[in-house]
């Protein structure tokens, strides 16, 4: 459907868009979406932040003396430990096997990639907080930092201790932990890694950066204190009711120990649930660990984390989350709770009604943006507008403003690689696309570096991300121009200017690329500067953080979409964003009131006055971000 906004061969911005038959189109989206804090349950600070996701093992090695050992990774997938192992060189070619890996004789690449450890740690994060501050980041979401043998740490051995190899004294920490009674919080010590985590939180807070941890409360790992006790003591274990045990060792019955793992993965034993959610034993443990990190040593919430991201929240009963939210908000009413729920918006809605979570990792925003900006056959601006309106209007007031508007994460291919492979499948079909976007499962997946045109499309997404309703979230390294297929390739070591990176010569099949296809691995300084610019625009203009929203331009024929961010007082500062998603340059005309000034914050474009209108020309696949002041 086309909305008639064309006057004298140009697009005209109107306060309310009208189609050719004079009837309003997408009335929900045409109404102003307002942020009204007095009726909201969300923490107001969460509207104003720019998020950065850190995958600790791959972010920065700040202390080589604490690096993992072969013994420390036993229990992680793949379960069979290799004969030869070492910490992997940070700047090495991702698909090239090192000599120690070749010596193992393992034919499957994915097993090599999962066994690698690069040595990222909390000291590395502390060392790079100034970088994050200079980028404009004001909140960090950490993938799990708790004790675990894996690189991703979603197989927790403990929730009340930071992984010893993230801290300065791994062996000393392990000795202290071994003396505890996990069921008695009064016996829990503060290890050197725990103390470093508290220091990291304080250093972040000094820079006005909020911190949230990843809570993996649906399951633990096979190395967990509780599960190991069940394996050892079977039916006599005090933890036997924590997990879903299918059978115990019983020679008389001829049964062997067996348990249920998350999605069939035996290395991730699931907690048992009843009608109230996770049963009382693990529930009490989770609650105690929650309090520990939110109000450490009972010194005050200012010393603790500012909230949680909850892994696979959809696998845990609603009643558990309702109880857990009450606990969290009783500790810190301003804590932010965000959930991983990758599903249709109407399936997400029950979790975001005020009694469970404040927001979500907004994958539906990424799906919708993909369909408009990246898909080979893009949806029309009118459909894009309607889908965005659903995401704004489906939830209670304030939720859309605190949803984490991301593109990629540790569970998806990087945005640059997604654009390179934009025709491989439907991103919204999460399960199927997950496999299609893994190089190991799709031999047609292109693992090359994005070219200049593809990077320009990434920038176009960033423009939308930084100006639209919701809190932007950047996956570590996207701002540097990192690329990679889905897990595990999306978890490459971070690019830093003081580390030398060899060229990517090898392909996933072990073959060398033709010389013309070799990719130089380096920081994309132009892309980094663009991220800094767009983040600064968002941080400097409160209207982009908390302002109301209104769609103002929809033209399906010309591929142009525009919206306005403004305060409740129309005389306040306004920002208009116009996206030209077509393959052609477009001229747009905007009405100009007397004494109004227009400034393009993004481009050094020239605007021409034509009576009561301002005209500007927007290049193909680009946008304008206009500041309008009285």
Regions found by a protein language model. Name each.
Residues 17-55, 59-61, 66-83, 90, ...:
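Carbohydrate-interacting/catalytic domains
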Residues 388-437:
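Aromatic-lined glycan-binding groove of carbohydrate-active enzymes
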């Amino acid at each position: 459907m086309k909305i008639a906004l064309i006057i004298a061969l140009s697009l005209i911005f109107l306060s309310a868009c009208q189609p050719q038959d004079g009837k309003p189109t997408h009335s929900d989206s045409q109404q102003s979406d307002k942020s009204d804090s007095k009726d909201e349950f969300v923490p107001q600070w969460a509207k104003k932040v720019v998020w950065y996701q850190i995958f600790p093992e791959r972010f920065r090695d700040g202390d080589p003396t604490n690096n993992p050992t072969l013994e420390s990774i036993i229990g992680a997938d793949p379960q069979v430990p290799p004969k030869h192992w070492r910490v992997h060189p940070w700047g090495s070619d991702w698909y090239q096997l090192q000599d120690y890996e070749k010596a193992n004789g393992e034919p499957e690449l994915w097993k090599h990639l999962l066994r690698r450890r690069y040595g990222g740690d909390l000291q590395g994060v502390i060392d790079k907080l100034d970088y994050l501050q200079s980028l404009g980041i004001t909140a960090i979401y950490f993938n799990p930092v708790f004790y675990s043998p894996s690189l991703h740490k979603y197989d927790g051995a403990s929730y009340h201790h930071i992984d010893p190899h993230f801290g300065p004294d791994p062996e000393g920490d392990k000795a202290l932990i071994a003396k505890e009674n996990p069921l008695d919080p009064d016996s829990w010590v503060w290890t050197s890694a725990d103390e470093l985590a508290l220091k990291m939180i304080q250093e972040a807070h000094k820079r006005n950066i909020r911190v949230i941890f990843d809570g993996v409360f649906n399951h633990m790992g096979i190395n967990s204190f509780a599960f190991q006790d069940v394996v050892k003591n079977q039916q006599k274990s005090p933890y036997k009711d924590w997990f879903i045990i299918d059978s115990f060792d019983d020679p008389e019955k001829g049964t062997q120990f067996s348990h249920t793992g998350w999605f069939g993965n035996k290395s991730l034993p699931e907690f048992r649930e009843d009608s109230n959610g996770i049963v009382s034993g693990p529930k009490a443990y989770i609650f105690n660990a929650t309090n520990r990190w939110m109000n450490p040593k009972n010194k005050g919430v200012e010393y603790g984390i500012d909230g949680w991201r909850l892994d696979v929240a959809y696998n845990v009963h609603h009643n558990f989350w309702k109880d857990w939210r009450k606990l969290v908000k009783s500790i810190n009413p301003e804590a932010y709770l965000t959930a991983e729920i990758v599903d249709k918006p109407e399936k997400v809605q029950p979790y975001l009604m005020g009694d469970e979570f404040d927001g979500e990792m907004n994958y539906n925003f990424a799906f919708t943006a993909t369909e408009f900006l990246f898909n080979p056959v893009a949806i029309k601006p009118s459909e894009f507008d309607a889908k965005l309106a659903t995401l704004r209007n489906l939830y209670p007031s304030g939720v859309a403003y605190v949803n984490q508007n991301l593109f990629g994460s540790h569970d998806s291919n990087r945005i640059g690689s997604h654009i390179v492979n934009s025709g491989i499948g439907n991103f919204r079909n999460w399960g199927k696309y997950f496999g299609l976007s893994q190089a190991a499962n799709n031999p047609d997946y292109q693992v090359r570096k994005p070219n200049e045109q593809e990077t320009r499309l990434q920038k176009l997404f960033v423009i939308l991300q930084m100006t639209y309703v919701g809190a932007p979230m950047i996956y570590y390294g996207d701002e540097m121009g990192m690329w990679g297929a889905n897990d595990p390739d999306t978890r490459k070591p971070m690019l830093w200017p003081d580390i030398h990176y060899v060229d990517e010569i090898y392909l996933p099949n072990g073959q060398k690329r033709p010389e013309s296809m070799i990719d130089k691995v380096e920081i994309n300084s132009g892309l980094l500067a663009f991220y800094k610019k767009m983040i600064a625009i968002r941080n400097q203009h409160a209207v982009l953080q908390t302002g109301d929203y209104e769609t103002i331009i929809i033209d399906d024929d010309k591929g142009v979409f525009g919206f306005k961010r403004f305060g409740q007082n129309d005389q306040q500062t306004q920002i208009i964003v116009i996206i030209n998603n077509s393959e052609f340059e477009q001229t747009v005309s905007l009405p100009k009131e007397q004494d109004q000034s227009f400034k393009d914050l993004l481009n050094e474009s020239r605007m021409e006055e034509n009576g009561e209108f301002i005209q500007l020309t927007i290049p193909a696949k680009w946008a304008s971000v206009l500041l309008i002041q009285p």
